[in-house]
């Protein structure tokens, strides 16, 4: 796995960034391995968490970006370029999950240890809900493949 992605999770943990990994990386942990050009992060949108994110960004090597504390994160628009052409896409809301609090999603998140780092991924049920709401061709394919692997229509 790309070291910069590991560093994201490592420094998010170290700086107490409240986040959930969603998108393609979450799809992969539920069994459907596909390539993805970005790492999608759902961020709890509080002042304290944004300060923690800013501090983590410095350690990751993305720089000290003061505007992190006030900027609007727009899915697929507000992203940060990582090494090897990967992008870090940060969002503060997820289509299809508007009726769920961040805490509810965090409490139901799947935690996977990767290189001794606890990494938080959106739980399977809510991943499927978000994928259905996004309804892009790749999301439809993800749902089909995940359902085959997990033998259910969740």
Residue ranges of model-derived segments:
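Compositionally biased terminal segments of proteins
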Residues: 1-154
